[in-house]
Amino acid sequence: MNIGFHILNDLTCILIKNFTDVPFITSDNPAFLTNRYYFKKDLLKYFSFGLNSMGTLLVLPISPEYCFLAYDKKVYFIPHNRGILKVKKDKDIEFMNQFQILNCNDNIYLNSTSSFEKYYEKYLKLRLASRHKITYSVLDESTYKHKRFKVIPSSDLKNYKDSEILTHMSTLHSRPDIWPSFLHWNIRGYGFSSNSGEGHVREKFKETLDPKYVHRVKI
């Protein structure tokens, strides 16, 4: 509990109140993490995002009428009133619901199928076949100063039984089909990077980056 609080206590937390006829749905894997900033910048070609990333969005449906949302205010602006956001557009609720389809393990829970059937098939096609990618690298060169590894396909591992091997696993994320109308960019938004596999992180995690290369990045 304390570890989670330390990681996320710089995020802004609000409740979304649903004023539409489309209820929030939930699933056997209801909490989801996404990042509009990473998708906008096409950063997933280089690294995945996590809980420390610049542009974090965390969503958890609570009931058909309410949904919890935590976001990086250094990247996004959401016009809520004292922590409550009233949503009156069906498409905004559809944004939240699509992730229950994309992220669920086996089951989706809902109190009405009328609106759900309209977009279920569309988002079902966007589900990833796998949620993780594993990359293998074998030792290619070694000196007293450094080691260099080269990436190989998994089918070649049998040829390197006696070699030093690095295994890297990254999380794959479904790309949303739509984004909600209430999620605006903070025009002064920023984060930090050191051009490393850490990616772009929030200011809170700036100290985890190599101080020689850390620099500020804008949205």
Segments predicted by a language model, with ranges:
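Alpha-helical structural context detector biased toward long hydrophobic helices
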Residues: M1-I219
